[in-house]
Each structure stands twice: as C-alpha cells, then as structure tokens.
Regions:
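Nucleotidyltransferase catalytic core that binds NTPs
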Residues: 1-171
Length: 171
C-alpha cells in the first residue's frame, strides 16, 4: 500500500476482472506466501518477486515522447510507479508555471494504461520518494537532466541497490 492506495482497487480500476476473480487470485497469492493475510500488502518474498520500476517527470502536457518513455519503462519490470513533479519543482525545472496542477497531472498520468500507480513527488529531495517506493529499477527519459551516477549514488545512501536505465530518444 502506497500513500493509502489499495492495490486491489488499482487492479479493479485497471482490469476487467470481476471481484470474485480478484479474490481467487489474491487467495492463491496468500497460499504462495506472496501476499499477507490483510490482502493488500506483500510479504518480503512477494516484494522480492516483483520488479518495480520508478519513472518521474513533470508531465504537464502528455506527448508521444512521454508515452514512448513510459512504455519502455514498463517493459523493464512488473509494476510501473510514476512520480509527477510538484508544482514548485515543475517551475524550477521548466522555468515557467505548469499549465496543469500537480493533482491534475497525477490524475492524467494515473489514467494511462501503462501506469500502475502515480504519485506526486517530494519537494527538494527525489530520494524521499525513491526510499518510499523501493524500486529495483529507476527509468530515466532520454531528455531528463539527472545523471545516472547521481541516481546510483543517491540510492546507495538510502541502502537501495537500484539499477538506472535511460530510454533512447524517440525517432
């Protein structure tokens, strides 16, 4: 469970599965010791079996480059968590006010089929969110300013051994 978001609700929203189908699958996952009895949190074994990919950006106006980058990020793992920059961070990055609020951008990104969960980032420190999500892979867009070395070193400081992958420029 991340920021109060129940994973079962995400599954219901993003799939055409019926409630009884979801319940049956969750029961199977509990029997395999992948999901806890509360039906919403993963066991350590379950957590280790999923490859979580974290991607981030401003996402003020979604364009084909965003879609390409998010599709490439999703292909790297099982769960794609996307972090939308706060309004203040967006101003610092883009040197202008965003057209859409951080909540609107979160809602828009969360509506994309490829995205499993979208969060609003933390002010000033990207590693607060990274520590919270604990991804195995951090996906960077081809045009993002962050350097792989900076991300790798920041992850080490929070005891996270995440791989960093940068997508190629869309042609």
């Amino acid at each position: 469970q991340i920021n109060g978001t129940n994973p079962v609700e995400i599954i219901k929203k993003k799939t055409m599965l019926l409630d009884n189908q979801i319940d049956t699958k969750i029961t199977e996952l509990i029997e395999k010791n992948l999901v806890n009895e509360d039906k919403i949190t993963l066991t350590e074994t379950g957590r280790d079996s999923l490859h979580i990919v974290l991607a981030g950006g401003v996402f003020d106006i979604i364009h084909p480059g965003h879609i390409s980058t998010l599709n490439a990020a999703k292909a790297l793992g099982d769960v794609l968590v996307v972090v939308v920059a706060t309004d203040n961070t967006a101003v610092k990055m883009k040197k202008r006010n965003p057209i859409h609020s951080q909540e609107q951008r979160q809602e828009l990104v969360n509506s994309l089929e490829v995205v499993d969960l979208c969060l609003i980032g933390q002010e000033e420190n990207i590693f607060k969110t990274v520590k919270h999500v604990r991804p195995q892979i951090i996906a960077l867009g081809y045009d993002q300013i962050h350097q792989e070395q900076f991300i790798t070193e920041g992850c080490k400081k929070i005891n996270l051994n995440a791989k960093v992958a940068r997508s190629e420029e869309r042609r």
